[in-house]
């Protein structure tokens, strides 16, 4: 895992990359949050969707809700970057739409969009 700390808009943003899946369950999400907080002192994280288990995008597993609720509970804002058009589930599209209209969780196409979005939040 590689974590790069970026300052944008006066905010510290952690951009996490890896060649393997980092979030497979709630505990691995909590571990990632703790590592990022410790290494970067940031509560804003950008991750590529490839770092998430595919079961995250199957809402029937409830994994997305459980994981994202932890981010919200710990006041960590996260932007997930990737091409989400490959998923045909209307429920997932609605979930992404609602998340993008909130203040904590975002699904965006590019890393730069993610950094820009997280830097504009309070």
Which functions belong to the PLM regions below?
Residues 2-122:
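Amphipathic, Lys/Arg-enriched alpha-helical "gate/interface" segment within cytosolic domains
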């Amino acid at each position: 895992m590689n974590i790069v700390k970026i300052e944008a808009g006066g905010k510290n943003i952690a951009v996490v990359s890896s060649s393997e899946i980092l979030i497979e369950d709630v505990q691995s999400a909590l571990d990632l949050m703790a590592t990022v907080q410790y290494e970067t002192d940031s509560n804003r994280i950008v991750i590529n969707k490839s770092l998430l288990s595919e079961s995250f995008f199957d809402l029937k597993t409830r994994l997305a809700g459980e994981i994202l609720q932890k981010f919200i509970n710990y006041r960590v804002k996260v932007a997930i970057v990737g091409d989400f058009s490959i998923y045909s589930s209307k429920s997932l599209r609605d979930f992404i739409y609602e998340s993008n209209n909130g203040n904590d969780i975002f699904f965006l196409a590019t890393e730069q969009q993610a950094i820009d979005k997280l830097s504009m939040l309070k």
